[in-house]
Design a protein with these regions (language model features):
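Conserved AAA+/SF3 P-loop NTPase catalytic/coupling segment centered on the Walker-B
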Residues: 28, 60-68, 81-110, 139-149, ...
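Short conserved motifs of the RecA-like P-loop NTPase core
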Residues: 184-200, 227-232
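Walker A/P-loop
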Residues: 14-50
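C-terminal helical "lid" of AAA+/P-loop NTPase domains
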Residues: 194-197, 206-221
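Conserved C-terminal helix/linker of AAA+ ATPases
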Residues: 212, 218-249
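Conserved catalytic/switch belt of AAA+ P-loop NTPases
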Residues: 100-125, 129
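Conserved AAA+ ATPase "SRH/arginine-finger" region at the nucleotide-binding site
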Residues: 153-167
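Pre-Walker A (pre-P-loop) alpha-helix and adjacent loop at the N terminus of AAA/AAA+ ATPase modules
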Residues: 1-14
Length: 285
């Protein structure tokens, strides 16, 4: 993943491969943040950040012409490749794109050049870096020449496949993130914390984050000067009905996230990468 960002001159195309809700779009955004923080893209002191553009390929599954115009532009070449110049262009669910669209992407990766839609006279250049995601087997669903042009394929595991420590750190990170967003300190009872950890999330990380948000929203209605305190009764009802709660007094034992011992001194972007996928091992050394 580090190689995908830093490989000269314009990085390497990378593909996140995993089930729905595992955080592929999230990881793509973090790759962008890492590239910005490492000054691989963008200019120091610039007034604005380099571009980051997300393309939902499912929107173009039945409209090849619209995709071609959006990607390359017309005679002026002002499509996504131009708008993402100097930044990152993320193709979500690339397998949903017809082969004709994937072939346009392949042609750009070959040379860094492209032509406007129905324009054979003008040739444009871009140094946009490309990231892809898919829930399918790449070798079976992608345009084969394009699949061969993506040297870095990163498997993204489901929550069920992650270790207990990974789940715990992820949960704490999401709770802290929600607390920062609301501008409050967050604490959570041991019962509620263990319920969140033990629950089987069908929609993976997306569902875990939704659970955190809804629980914080419920606790916010009882906010005090000390912040918010999440208890078992703030959890979604479907979660409570599927898990056996422990003794009641444990719901009074609180975990204060500001002093949570698993937190590290690394920046937030690198922490998330380490939690979700072990791609920054050499960066920490």
């Amino acid at each position: 993943c580090k190689a995908a960002v830093k490989y000269p001159p314009n990085g390497l195309p990378a593909l996140f491969n995993g089930a729905g809700g595992t955080g592929k779009s999230f990881l793509s955004r973090l790759m962008y943040e890492y590239a910005v923080n490492e000054r691989v893209i963008g200019t120091a002191g610039a007034a604005s950040l380099p571009p980051y553009i997300t393309v939902d390929c499912s929107e173009y599954a039945q409209n090849e012409e619209k995709f071609a115009i959006s990607l390359c532009g017309s005679e002026d070449g002002k499509g996504w490749l131009a708008k993402a110049n100097g930044g990152i262009l993320f193709f979500d669910e690339i397998d949903r794109l017809p082969f004709s669209g994937q072939e346009l992407i392949y042609s750009y990766l070959i040379s860094g050049q492209y032509k406007g839609y129905h324009d054979d006279e003008h040739v444009f250049e871009s140094n946009a870096r490309l990231i892809f995601s898919t829930t399918k087997v790449p070798a079976e669903t992608l345009y084969k020449p394009l699949a061969r042009m993506i040297p870095i394929v990163i498997p993204v595991p489901t929550l069920h496949e992650r270790t207990a420590d990974e789940k715990e750190e992820m949960l704490v990170s999401f709770l802290k993130e929600e607390g920062r967003r609301m501008g409050v300190d967050v604490s959570i009872s041991q019962n509620a914390f263990h319920c969140m950890l033990e629950f089987s999330y069908e929609n993976n990380i997306d569902e875990l984050k939704t659970c955190v948000t809804s629980s914080c929203a419920g606790a916010y209605l009882e906010k005090t000067s000390d912040g918010i305190a999440i208890h078992s009764y703030h959890l979604p009802e479907y979660m409570l009905s599927s898990l056996k709660l422990e003794v009641e007094d444990k719901d009074k034992r609180m975990i204060h996230l500001n002093s949570y011992s698993r937190d590290t001194s690394l920046g937030q972007t690198v922490q998330y990468f380490q939690i979700m996928l072990d791609v920054f091992e050499d960066y920490r050394q």
